[in-house]
Amino acid sequence: MTTIHRRPAPWRGNAVFCASAAFAAGLETLFARLLERRPADSAEALLRQRLHHELEHGSGVLLHDSALLRGLAEDEFQRVFRAFCQWLGRTVAINRNGEYLKEVRDLGLRDARDAPQRGHLTSQELAFHSDRADLTVLACWSPARRGGAFRIRSSADVLATLEAANPAWLPLLGQPIPHDLRDEGDADYALVPLLTETPRTFVLRYIRKFNESVTRHGLSLAPQVRSMLDGLDEAIERADGYAELDFSKGMLVLVNNHTTLHARTEFSDDERQRRCLLRCWLSSEFTRELPESFLPLVHQVAAGSLRGGIRPLAQEPRP
């Protein structure tokens, strides 16, 4: 029987990180085992189940500042992070090259509406959005010299804010609108609703620049849709709503892309310090069913199915 995933309890601010303390000792023990390549411990199954429950039915967020990761050399850091991601879920491709683990760093690129680039390869501000996978996992190898704060917003609180301030927009959130596939799908664009809420499932998927860039394909957004997106942005970006953290080496963050949104402030590097995060997208067997309109985005919509990520140009062996 499929588990019901109703709208979770809303939250605001950095208090959301308090629940993560309950996982700290177990995660450090797990990282030590992965580093030493020892066989799995029987207690790890319960830890994994608890983590997924927090991500699916709780806050949708986990923050862990790992002393073990902080002390590792680069090759061991990457190996332990990769092993952790494979332990937690099923990795899905993060780009058309079929890579499953990618460094988030500034390569000097600039993302623009008519000349799209992957945001994680720029130093630009990234507005609140959700990724193309059930879960996003990030680990900091090196923080930026300046900027690069990471922000997380409760989707349930965003909707509660809209319900109180602009209830007229709520029906529009459930209507499909054009979503640019950014040259990473089988078509130019898809028609996808921002909000799906039924007695069995809850999903808020939002990445406004993908709605705006459909102009590349000769489309335009109706004035009413633009007004609705403006109202949604206002609810998302309220200063007392989001949690915020400054990355430091060894810091690990997990977010559920169906129940939270995340953002990044602009950053700058110098020769001595360059921002570098490791990023992995995961499919979770514990997650919810999605609407059929999500098929162009995630390829499968059944609860717990292997889904999400970007379909590679050529299939490569999974790591």
Residue ranges of predicted features:
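A short alpha->loop->secondary-structure connector
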Residues: F81-T91
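Internal, non-catalytic "lid/hinge" segments that mediate substrate recognition, gating
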Residues: A93-R96
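Short glycine-centered, acidic/aromatic-flanked micro-motifs in structured strand/loop junctions
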Residues: S66
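Active-site environment of non-heme Fe oxygenases that use a 2-His-1-carboxylate facial triad
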Residues: M1-A45, Q49, H57-L62, R70-G71, ...
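"Short basic amphipathic alpha-helical interaction patches in structured regions
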Residues: D75-R82, I152-S154
